Amino acid sequence: MKYLEKNINLVQVKKDYAEEESTKLSTKSPSQAQSTSNGVEQFKMKYREKNFLSSFLDKNCPSFSEDFELTKFISCGGTGVVYEGQMRKKKNKQKLAFKFKFSKKQNKDKDEFQEIGILKKLHNKNITNIYAFTKVGTTMHYCVLELGKHGDLERFTKVLLKRKVLPETILCYFAFQILEALEYIHKCKIIHNDIKQGNIVVDANLDIKLTDFSVSCTYANFDPDDLVEFPFMGTSKYICPEILGHVQMAVKEACKIDLYSLGVTLYELAFGKYPYNLNEIENKDYNKILNNIKTEKLEFPKDKKISGLCKDFLRGLLEKDYKQRFNIQQALKHPWIQGAKIINEEKENVYCLESFLINIITDNIPKFNEYIKDENKKLERSN
């Protein structure tokens, strides 16, 4: 990607974006900082202090500094922080992700390490790998994970591509990979529960990796027809209406929880805003979010170049009634997603990744464009 960065002058953009994100996190008012007394918020407020994390680890886990070095801050979540780093003693300085997670209950909660157990069980090209896991004291643990070179989808779009939205070709390319990852975890009877841009990273090969299984749940002990009220987890504007409304649903329909969240994510990537006019609603106003989903129509901005075929696919994912919503097989068989096969062929035939990226961000894959036109005509005739 050095070629691309040199030619579209992204180095300063990356720096500016990182500083902007850091400023957002480091300028909270005292009242905000005092809104919670747990160690998580205190830690998040201090991460910008020089050598704070290194000093903390030197005191509580001396072996960490012997084995690893942290190079830069990546992100801050609800229960901890993520840094980029590498092994000290290896000649091959492979970049790694270090996720530090704090607990309120001194790790007495059996769910505290659920993410670790899930990641150890999952082995798929579109799911991030876990390499190591260590407890630090009684209230913190860290895991060493595969690093997505180009960051999450939000950073990939805004920083690398310098865009507010993704062109349809690359949107289709990523959507297909996310669906394949979801198909795999659903076969393992796992619901991710927090599909969004921040939990989908892009690696050096321009492939996506699903990450952050901290609020995931398993349903291996249930029968397919069992009625279950699934836990209220995830990020509010990505949560499906049946979860917001505390509706019991059959376990066999559980995959549709993630598919709705994927629909919100793809809509946001395509149009730069949430569906159902959710942008102006506070994240914690769950009743208002649910009311908007129930009462607002699913509309698509007319000023965006998105095909009718793509919109038809999004309608299937964002169906309010989960019984009518796409399941994973319906989503994978949709004509729009099938177009990803053409994009993958293009990737195999190009001489370098830079050329492939330029083609997909400029919608310059003629075979895909012709395919979409033909399928659009079929869709129009059927309607």
Which functions belong to the PLM regions below?
Residues 174-175:
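Activation segment signature within eukaryotic-like protein kinase domains
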Residues 129-141:
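Short beta-strand micro-motifs within the conserved protein kinase catalytic domain, predominantly
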Residues 139-152:
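Conserved short submotifs of the Hanks-type protein kinase catalytic core
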Residues 203-236:
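Activation segment/activation loop of eukaryotic-type protein kinase catalytic domains
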Residues 71-78, 82:
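Protein kinase glycine-rich loop
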Residues 100-122:
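Conserved N-lobe beta3->alphaC-helix segment of eukaryotic protein kinase catalytic domains
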Residues 186-203:
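Catalytic-loop of the protein kinase fold
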